[in-house]
UniProtKB/Swiss-Prot annotation:
Record InterPro entries: MINAR1-like, MINAR1-like_C
Bilayer topology annotation: Single-pass membrane protein
Signal peptide limits: none
Name listed for the protein in its UniProt record: Major intrinsically disordered NOTCH2-binding receptor 1-like
Stored PANTHER family: MAJOR INTRINSICALLY DISORDERED NOTCH2-BINDING RECEPTOR 1 MINAR1 FAMILY MEMBER, MAJOR INTRINSICALLY DISORDERED NOTCH2-BINDING RECEPTOR 1-LIKE
Keyword flag Glycoprotein: yes
Superkingdom to which the source organism belongs: Eukaryota
Family label: Belongs to the MINAR family.
């Protein structure tokens, strides 16, 4: 039977310390007191405007994130154009297939509606 009492002996402040604080590669990182920095923003709008590639934050915020150029502004992915062409061709094929299936179903329904009464009428005579 597994009980928590067995684990209580092994939980010490040393085992609760994060490994990153003990790692010498990260020893230069100072621990920032979050309580002191909550009231002071790390970036103001003017600082953000100076450091970003977009220049004016207000102009940048006017852009529509639903626009594809918003996300792919300076990014070029090789083969992206061909991928878009393949997707467009696939959507066109799907639309044609759906239209053809609808027309076929409609024709079958019309044929059944016309032939069933004729067959029933002939079988009565």
């Amino acid at each position: 039977m597994f009980e928590d009492k067995e684990l209580e002996k092994h939980i010490t402040p040393q085992t609760l310390k994060p490994k990153i604080k003990q790692n010498p590669l990260y020893s230069h990182i100072n621990i920032i007191q979050t309580e002191e920095n909550k009231s002071k923003p790390s970036w103001t709008i003017q600082d953000y405007d100076r450091h970003t590639s977009h220049g004016q934050l207000a102009d940048y915020m006017k852009e529509d994130p639903r626009d594809l150029s918003f996300w792919l502004e300076d990014l070029y992915t090789p083969g992206y154009d061909s991928l878009l062409k393949k997707k467009a061709a696939e959507m066109k094929r799907n639309k044609i297939c759906k239209t053809f299936a609808f027309i076929t179903l409609f024709v079958c329904a019309v044929v059944i509606i016309i032939t069933v009464p004729i067959v029933v009428k002939q079988s009565r005579d």
